[in-house]
Amino acid sequence: MQKFRVYGQSRLRGSVNISGAKNAALPILFAAILAQEPVKLTNVPELKDIETTLKILRKLGVVVERDAEGAVHLDASKIDHFVAPYELVKTMRASIWALAPLVARFHRGQVSLPGGCSIGARPVDLHISGLERLGASIILEDGYVKAYVDHCLVGTRIVMEKVSVGATLSIMMAATLAKGKTIIENAAREPEITDTALFLNKMGAKIVGAGTDTITVEGVERLGGCEHSIVPDRIETGTFLVAAAISGGRIECKNTKADTLDAVIDKLREAGAQVDVTENSITLDMLGNRPRAVNIRTAPYPGFPTDMQAQFTLLNMVACGTSIITETIFENRFMHIPELIRMGGKAEIEGNTAICHGVDHLSGAEVMATDLRASISLVLAGCIATGETIVDRIYHIDRGYERIEEKLRGLGARIERFSAQSEES
């Protein structure tokens, strides 16, 4: 088991190149199953979840290669297997995205009920009901979601009972090869959905309205190959901006897009940060000041992203004043708070609300990561705390942040990865 050792009291300064968005790369990789010709993807981050996805695709018969420049080449023309097995799926909830393209193109598919972060219920019901509305028959059996359709999926009007990024993507992918028109209402609007739709359209799909709450898909007979660059990771961008804010530093995030982060930038400015944006960069300068507390309420895009909640919880714990954080997207997503309290933070949890009281400083401690975004908040806390912080279970971080210790060291952090076994010996 690997851990991070972080030495604190670092003021983070410099520039950092933002990686491609994991939350766009994953559905796009699975969407490549739909293509009957080769696909080339660039700006694909090197992450555990990406590695798992590529293993699943290889298991299905997709020819996968990552070249010397980091581009991923996919050839799904000879898929001969239609089951995403438990041993691969168990670590990653996003693997449910394999089902829709398999059913759409091959009229059958099986995916083991998935695993992933421990942040409450993320049921696959909306994925299943969407496929059923398109004409698929679904059986839950032996721990697998099994789907099939006699001829082809048929377009229809689907009103999402709740806004769901994952289900919107599944339905959109499936509808590309369905007969007729599919209209998805109350669709999620995240930039990653827009990027996936752009990729599908490059392959020959007919999708309009991605990025709005109504997406229309006119089914086509086949999809071909294309080249596509994954959109920059807005959550990684936001994470480094928070790192500058809590450390009184200045960080320029390069190769990113400010127009996907309006809600986050607004809150950082409210906290007292100076934020400057260009077409491809965002720079935050805290001017050596301590941030002001800001209230946060997570919401579907374009609202405040739930994936930035843990980072802003940390910001509020070292800010001037008291703040209220309300989590409306996922249950059980405050597991980082007890760990931050171990470091001297002050907060109370009441249902889906946390009340944070800013303190002058945090103190290093041994803490345990519980999910991807919680884990990065603990690492950043270690960067600014007094003393030494040990962060356990950092495999969560490797699922979603590319070369995180290298990037943090480039900004002045003192952080090292070590094996628990070597420490004990």
From Swiss-Prot:
<feature type="binding site">
    <location>
        <begin position="22"/>
        <end position="23"/>
    </location>
    <ligand>
        <name>phosphoenolpyruvate</name>
    </ligand>
</feature>
<dbReference type="InterPro" id="IPR036968">
    <property type="entry name" value="Enolpyruvate_Tfrase_sf"/>
</dbReference>
<keyword id="KW-0133">Cell shape</keyword>
<keyword id="KW-0808">Transferase</keyword>
<feature type="modified residue" description="2-(S-cysteinyl)pyruvic acid O-phosphothioketal">
    <location>
        <position position="117"/>
    </location>
</feature>
<protein>
    <recommendedName>
        <fullName>UDP-N-acetylglucosamine 1-carboxyvinyltransferase</fullName>
        <ecNumber>2.5.1.7</ecNumber>
    </recommendedName>
</protein>
<keyword id="KW-0961">Cell wall biogenesis/degradation</keyword>
<keyword id="KW-0963">Cytoplasm</keyword>
<dbReference type="GO" id="GO:0008360">
    <property type="term" value="P:regulation of cell shape"/>
</dbReference>
<keyword id="KW-0132">Cell division</keyword>
<dbReference type="GO" id="GO:0009252">
    <property type="term" value="P:peptidoglycan biosynthetic process"/>
</dbReference>
<dbReference type="GO" id="GO:0019277">
    <property type="term" value="P:UDP-N-acetylgalactosamine biosynthetic process"/>
</dbReference>
<dbReference type="GO" id="GO:0008760">
    <property type="term" value="F:UDP-N-acetylglucosamine 1-carboxyvinyltransferase activity"/>
</dbReference>
<comment type="similarity">
    <text>Belongs to the EPSP synthase family. MurA subfamily.</text>
</comment>
<comment type="function">
    <text>Cell wall formation. Adds enolpyruvyl to UDP-N-acetylglucosamine.</text>
</comment>
<dbReference type="InterPro" id="IPR013792">
    <property type="entry name" value="RNA3'P_cycl/enolpyr_Trfase_a/b"/>
</dbReference>
<dbReference type="GO" id="GO:0071555">
    <property type="term" value="P:cell wall organization"/>
</dbReference>
<feature type="binding site">
    <location>
        <position position="329"/>
    </location>
    <ligand>
        <name>UDP-N-acetyl-alpha-D-glucosamine</name>
    </ligand>
</feature>
<keyword id="KW-0573">Peptidoglycan synthesis</keyword>
<dbReference type="Pfam" id="PF00275">
    <property type="entry name" value="EPSP_synthase"/>
</dbReference>
<dbReference type="InterPro" id="IPR001986">
    <property type="entry name" value="Enolpyruvate_Tfrase_dom"/>
</dbReference>
<feature type="binding site">
    <location>
        <begin position="162"/>
        <end position="165"/>
    </location>
    <ligand>
        <name>UDP-N-acetyl-alpha-D-glucosamine</name>
    </ligand>
</feature>
<dbReference type="InterPro" id="IPR005750">
    <property type="entry name" value="UDP_GlcNAc_COvinyl_MurA"/>
</dbReference>
<dbReference type="GO" id="GO:0051301">
    <property type="term" value="P:cell division"/>
</dbReference>
<keyword id="KW-0670">Pyruvate</keyword>
<comment type="pathway">
    <text>Cell wall biogenesis; peptidoglycan biosynthesis.</text>
</comment>
<feature type="binding site">
    <location>
        <begin position="122"/>
        <end position="126"/>
    </location>
    <ligand>
        <name>UDP-N-acetyl-alpha-D-glucosamine</name>
    </ligand>
</feature>
<dbReference type="GO" id="GO:0005737">
    <property type="term" value="C:cytoplasm"/>
</dbReference>
<feature type="binding site">
    <location>
        <position position="93"/>
    </location>
    <ligand>
        <name>UDP-N-acetyl-alpha-D-glucosamine</name>
    </ligand>
</feature>
<feature type="active site" description="Proton donor">
    <location>
        <position position="117"/>
    </location>
</feature>
<dbReference type="InterPro" id="IPR050068">
    <property type="entry name" value="MurA_subfamily"/>
</dbReference>
<feature type="binding site">
    <location>
        <position position="307"/>
    </location>
    <ligand>
        <name>UDP-N-acetyl-alpha-D-glucosamine</name>
    </ligand>
</feature>
<keyword id="KW-0131">Cell cycle</keyword>
